[in-house]
């Protein structure tokens, strides 16, 4: 089955293609299909809705938009990092925390600066991911995943993307960026969301 992936993020493309190939899905980036303007993400802020619903709203919005545009099933996700002490920032704004969408270096540096006054338990946070699959006939399935850790004030590791070099996993003694893709897919927020989605798809007979 062919499914369109609503992202231009190369890291996400690699992760989704690897995992969904397990059920025979051919995951094709939207950029390989058509030059379609990206939808504006209008997920409500955390102060107005719970974290999960904000991510879910954005994931569904993207998937619905592209499913209508290309008339094919679309896979989308919305994810981000949450620093508990900051009142759930960066959250749905993770990819553009420093003002420019997709600038990992700038986003990481801003988070380091904002968290600079905090130490120890105050630096706890988590990654959150919500995945959505939307079909042109209106069917929709969503799944979520979460990964807890500590947001460090220095970088370590060269793998992954986003905030992975800052996100330390005490149980592994590594940052997310130090994990292999196989390790990351087992324990990351996105890996857990994919696991939940694959289970739901199987239960639905898809």
Predicted segments, located by residue:
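Anionic-ligand binding patches
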Residues: 2-4, 10-206
């Amino acid at each position: 089955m062919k499914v369109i992936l609503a992202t231009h993020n190369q890291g996400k493309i690699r992760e989704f293609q690897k995992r969904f190939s397990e059920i025979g899905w051919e995951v094709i980036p939207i950029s390989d299909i058509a030059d379609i303007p990206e939808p504006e993400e209008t997920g409500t802020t955390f102060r107005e809705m719970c974290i999960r619903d904000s991510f879910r709203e954005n994931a569904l919005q993207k998937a619905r938009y592209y499913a209508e545009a290309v008339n094919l099933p679309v896979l989308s996700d919305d994810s981000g990092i949450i620093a508990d002490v900051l009142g759930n920032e960066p959250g749905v704004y993770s990819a553009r925390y420093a003002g420019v969408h997709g600038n990992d270096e700038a986003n990481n540096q801003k988070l380091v600066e904002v968290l600079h006054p905090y130490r120890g338990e105050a630096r706890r946070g988590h990654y959150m991911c919500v995945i959505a699959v939307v079909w042109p006939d209106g069917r929709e399935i969503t799944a979520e995943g979460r990964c807890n850790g500590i947001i460090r004030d220095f970088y370590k590791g060269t793998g992954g993307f986003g905030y992975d070099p800052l996100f330390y996993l005490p149980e592994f003694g590594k940052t997310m960026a130090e994990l292999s893709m196989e390790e990351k897919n087992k324990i990351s927020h996105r890996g857990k969301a994919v696991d939940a989605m694959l289970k739901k798809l199987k239960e639905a007979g898809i």
